[in-house]
Swiss-Prot record:
Molecular functions (GO terms): ATP binding; metal ion binding; pantothenate kinase activity
Keywords attached to this entry: ATP-binding, Coenzyme A biosynthesis, Cytoplasm, Kinase, Metal-binding, Nucleotide-binding, Potassium, Transferase
Annotated binding of substrate, by residue: G108, A109, D110, R111, T187
Protein name: Type III pantothenate kinase
Gene3D superfamilies the UniProt entry points to: 3.30.420.40
Taxonomic lineage: Bacteria, Pseudomonadati, Pseudomonadota, Alphaproteobacteria, Sphingomonadales
Active site location: D110
UniProt binding sites for ATP: D6, A7, G8, N9, T10, N11, I12, V13, T133
Regions annotated as coiled coil: none
Pathway of action: Cofactor biosynthesis; coenzyme A biosynthesis; CoA from (R)-pantothenate: step 1/5
Cellular component aspect of the GO annotation: cytoplasm
Family: Belongs to the type III pantothenate kinase family.
Length: 275
């Protein structure tokens, strides 16, 4: 079974993937100082609660946009699961899709695994919208080439900036406003309107402009924890794929399975035998 570790700026998701089925997933706050042992204590206990054992894990893939987390996640893979992890985005990794942009090496690994999953799951042109710490819009053409996109502040980031810089504004929950009116009758209603309806306007406006530039029919795929929140009041999404990133990581692993990794008393050593 594959352990897929998706380390974002806000949370790290650990998912167990068996073939094309995602058997379980757990989430922990991203913390660069957390050690491999700390990850293991937390993860192995949750696996046990779910009825899984360490011995069932025979492969690991890691996708991180937070470099300081990578080393300890690699140690976690080697020390506790006995395998060398495949690292998404590590040169000279061949993604299996063309990356048709300026400076391909600067594109985030999370955006590329989303592109890979979008290409394999849907035909034609695709726009993958991922609601994370940043909100990203990524275009994958009908041949599977990654053609670029948009990076905008995520909704939590926008709210943090608003509350942090405006001393008299209160912290509010990110939720669907209680009224369809965009005109707030109180400070809280006005903030809900700006955050929620403002984001709807951004999503619809940017997606429409991308469609106009592409000039061909496009499937719009939404992913990330807040996708379903916005789907209530916009018809711009054709598909919601909550696990797009994890599915892309599993596809990447299928294409580029790494070698075995064995531990011994003097440290860790790769035996380079195929899985």
């Amino acid at each position: 079974m594959l352990l897929a570790i998706d380390a974002g700026n806000t949370n790290i998701v650990f998912a167990l993937v068996d073939g094309r089925e995602i058997r379980a997933r757990w989430r922990i706050a991203t913390e660069g100082r957390r050690t491999a042992d700390e990850y293991a204590v937390w993860l192995v206990q949750l696996m046990a609660i779910g009825g899984f054992t360490r011995e069932e894990i025979d492969s690991v893939v890691i996708c991180t946009v937070v470099p300081r987390t990578l080393h300890n996640l690699e140690v976690l893979s080697a020390k506790y699961f006995g395998v060398k992890a495949l690292i998404a985005g590590t040169p000279p990794l061949d993604w299996g899709i063309d990356i048709d942009v300026i400076s391909p090496e600067t594109v985030g690994a999370d955006r590329l695994v989303n592109a890979l999953a979008a290409h394999h799951l849907h035909s034609g042109h695709k726009i993958a919208i991922d609601f994370g710490t940043a909100t990203t819009f990524d275009w994958v053409d009908e041949k599977g080439a990654y053609r670029g996109g948009i990076i905008a502040p995520g909704i939590n980031l926008s709210l943090d900036a608003l509350v942090g810089k405006a001393a008299r504004l209160p912290r509010i929950a990110i939720e669907i406003p209680k009224t369809d009116s965009v005109i707030g009758r109180s400070t809280e209603e006005s903030m809900h309107s700006g955050i929620y309806w403002g984001y709807i306007a951004m999503i619809e406006g940017l997606t429409e402009r991308m469609k106009q530039e592409i000039g061909q029919p496009v499937t719009v795929i939404a992913t990330g924890g807040l996708a379903s929140l916005f789907a209530v009041h916009t018809s711009v999404f054709d598909v919601i794929e909550p696990d797009l990133t994890i599915r892309g990581m599993a596809l990447l692993y299928e294409q580029k399975a790494p070698t075995k990794f064995t531990a011994h008393s003097g440290g860790f050593a790769a035996d380079f035998s195929p899985l």
